[in-house]
Amino acid sequence: MRTSAQILPLVKDPERLEARLSEIPPEPGVYFMRDGSDRIIYIGKSRKLRSRVRSYFREGYNKTERIATMAKLVTEIEFIVTDTEAEALALEANLIKQHQPYFNVLLKDDKKYPYVCITWSEDYPRIFITRKRQLGKEKDKYYGPYTDSGLLREILRISKRIFALRQRPQPLFKDRPCLNYDLGRCPGVCQQLISPEEYRKTVQKVAMVFQGRTQELIDILSEQMEKAAEALNFEVAARIRDQIAGLKSLTAEQKVSLPDDTVSRDAIALAADAQHACIQLFQIRAGQLVGRLAFVAESHAEPGAILQRVLEEHYQTAESVEIPAEILVQHELPDAEILADVLTQRKGRKVTIFTPQRQVKAELIEMVERNAQYELQRMQKLGDRNHQATQDLAAILDLPDLPHRIEGYDISHIQGSNAVASQVVFIDGLPAKQNYRHYKIKNPTVTIGHSDDFASLAEVIQRRFRKYAEDPQLSRVGNPDWPDLIMIDGGKGQLSSVVAVLQEMNLLEDLRVISLAKRREEIFLPGESQPLKTDAEQPGVQLLRRLRDEAHRFAVSFHRQQRSDKLKRSRLDEIPGLGHHRQKQLLAHFRSVDYIRQATPAQIAEVPGIGPHLAQAIYDYFHPSHV
């Protein structure tokens, strides 16, 4: 790997800079900026790579302070040429997600804002609310993130009432539909009483609601209702009439109504402080507000660049019908023309992006900005509360600095069976779920009927910090994974077991570790026989309680999952020739042991890796009377 001592920044080596710039072609593509440690620190796109990259190093060129700082660190420039600007736009977005360059605008994964997911990858798609966007299945569609989770749940509830949708993730009975089918609330998906093709048509109607196409859907249904009435099919006409009435109630419940027009438009604005930018995007269709989306980003870039980044990511997976004809922006975008051209190509109609200066459209942007400002104030209040809690905790524990990263550990089991541990992480007082970890306890002394929380905690801590003990050169200064504080759920005994293993690893001096006992919320320190004198209502103690409760919740949920998986596997373990890998394939295909029991040998043989002979053996196991 190159080091800064070996390679000077390009701005300090004009001859090499000019040679490198001359190699870059005047074509569309993506460029990478690397620093002296060979890290990618910035990724950008342009319709003309050469002129865009050259602009970063031009004297007198209007650059933000952050971009000017970035340019002084660049030691190498790389590029990828693309055929079109659209390809460059998509490639840039994917590479930024992959490399997370320091000087790019990075959107934060704020799980406060929920999405609606439609699992188009499944024969019978599910529709549900989630706070985590999974990127593995390209066919699945996410709408959001929405600002009002209560309104979102109400829309989904009404949608399920209007259209007959599956009501349960798993069937209630193995051989018949539940009461929802008899009431007309579900088409009997669990027993496949409706074909996947017909069910997907129903789901597509619900998707139109979340695409902001409610009025278009009402028009389609109105036409279908008239045709049904003309054909004297009054039962169908009445059902469609009820669906239209339900959809109109959804429209009536929207919180803002704008002057009616036929133009679809999105309006985006932000409010920012020194750390965060809160962005709101309002979706207006047929003159009504049909969606309020929210995003959070770091605020180190220019406002226009932040808005551009949000719009690029938002529209990256949007279908053509979801792209509006107009996009109103609070600040001018650095590459508005490129984005507009790309969206125009995808929509098949002209898309314009501009900053309104007066009248109704300017007032709309002001309204979006006010909502973004309210959200920023909410975030600031939450940040102040957490800052106060970390300050109080630092004072209680006499820490030299505020604890930025705190890790909490807990053990869960039932009399030693399926023993697991949790590691949860709070960053600046807030849960950082992307850093959560769970462990299966491997200690042979922890068995059914014989639990040992002390040994289990010692094992987990040893596994967590093993690499630091084995490699003394591994720097802990500036390491984002290194905790400022470790909290163990338990009392003096649990703490002593962790202290002992850290001493063996020569890490005790580098780590601050405490325990929090459930009785009276007592805090214990290493080597102290008595707990600290604290008030359970102190902000710092409340922060530890939130951490402890989250560690307990995460450990218990993983323990339940392990027990459930074991119960599923235990029956399959009894079938000769059916190893763990094939068991996983069977469960992935049929979803449950009950479904495997109901399957025919031919259906079982459809599972990859399950031949006719093994399929017959599986069938015979569940149907011994047929053998």
Swiss-Prot record:
It comes from the Bacteria. GO terms for biological process: nucleotide-excision repair; SOS response. Interacts with UvrB in an incision complex. It is found in: Cytoplasm. The gene is uvrC. Keywords: Cytoplasm, DNA damage, DNA excision, DNA repair, Excision nuclease, SOS response. PROSITE patterns: GIY_YIG, UVR, UVRC. GO terms for cellular component: cytoplasm; excinuclease repair complex. Signal peptide: none annotated. Residues 215-250 form the UVR domain. The lineage of its organism: Bacteria, Bacillati, Cyanobacteriota, Cyanophyceae, Nostocales. Residues 26-105 form the GIY-YIG domain. SMART domains: GIYc, HhH1. GO terms for molecular function: DNA binding; excinuclease ABC activity. Belongs to the UvrC family. It comes from Trichormus variabilis (strain ATCC 29413 / PCC 7937). The UvrABC repair system catalyzes the recognition and processing of DNA lesions. UvrC both incises the 5' and 3' sides of the lesion. The N-terminal half is responsible for the 3' incision and the C-terminal half is responsible for the 5' incision. NCBIfam families: PRK00558.1-5, uvrC. This is UvrABC system protein C.
